[in-house]
Regions:
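Conserved SAM-binding loop of SAM-dependent methyltransferases across substrates and taxa
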Residues: 81-94
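Conserved S-adenosyl-L-methionine
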Residues: 76-80
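A general structural signal for well-ordered alpha-helical segments in protein cores
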Residues: 3, 25, 29, 55-58, ...
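Class I SAM-dependent transferase core
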Residues: 1-71, 75, 105-108, 112-122
Length: 221
């Protein structure tokens, strides 16, 4: 997916985007390509699909949550090179984002890119989530660990909810978490990303771009 296709999609989904935000989204590709020459932050293959596999995927959290993230304090756990935190920080400039990862080279990249984009609402820290002080309104993350492993890391860290990007067959994972933590199945909600992104949203893009989202979900608990 090229930027033009990405721009067409997000300007339909988020009607109040400014030119500044669009320029920030556009600049991301070259920044990650430059960093990937030094540090393999995202796979070489995924640099070709950065607008679909990374930006649009990250923004699907906003497609689900809509204005609930506006003006909030948000923790991105296991951010890696800055996903989903950096795209969400562009979309919600009035929200405060803390991006954490335990690997120093990844936080180096995320911090540099946030600074290059002029994102004053982003703080990047090298730390494990469970060691961070304080609470946040929301926790977000992208496929860092199973629910059984992830939930203890963020216990007591959020006031409202956890929003996770997941792929594949999520039902066994949800069932395992419900069993271990004695949660009712209805307390974990799953939302299919393709209920937000339809095939007609991909003008000029290959069918592969749309198909990639087929087994992608946002989970909230």
């Amino acid at each position: 997916m090229d930027f033009k296709t990405f721009e067409t999609i997000i300007t339909k989904k988020f009607l109040s985007l400014t030119n500044k935000q669009l320029e920030q989204f556009k600049a991301i590709e070259s920044l990650y390509r430059e960093w990937n020459e030094k540090i393999n932050v995202i796979s070489r293959k995924d640099t070709e699909g950065i607008f679909s596999h990374h930006l649009l995927h990250s923004l699907s959290i906003a497609g689900y949550a809509q204005n609930r993230l506006s003006g909030k304090e948000i923790l991105d756990v296991g951010t890696g090179g800055g996903f989903p935190g950096i795209p969400l920080a562009i979309l919600y400039p009035e929200s405060r984002f803390t991006l954490c990862d335990s690997i120093g080279k990844k936080t180096l990249v995320a911090r540099s890119i946030a600074e290059s984009l002029g994102l004053e609402n982003v703080t990047v820290v090298q730390a494990r989530a469970e060691s961070l002080p304080g609470e946040f309104d929301f926790v977000v993350s992208r496929a860092v660990a199973s629910l059984e492993d992830f939930l203890p890391w963020v216990k007591g860290k959020y006031r409202e909810s956890v929003l996770l990007l997941k792929g594949g067959d999520i039902n066994p994972e949800i069932a395992a978490a419900c069993g271990r933590f004695r949660l009712s199945p209805g307390s974990i909600r799953s939302w299919k990303v393709q209920s937000w992104l339809q095939a007609e949203d991909f003008p000029g893009a290959s069918a592969e771009d749309y198909a990639w989202f087929q087994e992608k979900f946002v989970i909230e608990l």
